Amino acid sequence: MTPIELSTRRRVTGLTSDEFARLFVSLQREVDGEAAQWSATDVESWELVGPPVTAEQHLIDTFAAANEFVSTLADRLYHTIMPVTEDSVITAYSDDITFWGSHPDLGGVPHALWNIAVLQAAEWARKETGIICELDVRKPLV
């Protein structure tokens, strides 16, 4: 995977370099039978110098996990807000700490993935009903 491909694929997920790097590190597993030892700083640098060959499959798996999370969550949120009304409100988060405080079971997942799923669910509801959900953005806890 070239640096430009990595950068482009990361941007498509909606994550910043830092958010993607932290997600990648949190999902690390073994590489060639040994525990992977990459740091978030290593992962961020790969957008400039390219990732090591040993990280390539793990990068692909991380992108797939992020996309699957957003797809599954958007579907859950859509079914939660339906039937949508003029008073329907859906919550987005402005930072990870506030998001994790509201959803401790999702600790470690970047708030950006939640927000993408929220927007996708709201768009599906709008297309089906013509009603636009209000978006409530939670202020940071700190």
Question: What is each model feature region?
Answer:
Residues 1-13:
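A short, Lys/Arg-rich alpha-helix, primarily the initiator
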Residues 6, 20-21, 43-46:
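Conserved hydrophobic/aromatic packing and binding residues within compact polymer-binding modules
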Residues 12, 23, 127-128:
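Residues at alpha-helix termini
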Residues 25-29, 68, 126:
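A general structural signal for alpha-helical elements within enzymatic catalytic domains
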Residues 25-54:
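Recognition helix of helix-turn-helix/homeodomain-like DNA-binding domains
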Residues 54-70:
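Short Lys/Arg-enriched helix C-cap and helix-to-coil transition segments
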Residues 71-142:
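Helix-turn-helix/homeodomain-like alpha-helical modules used for DNA recognition
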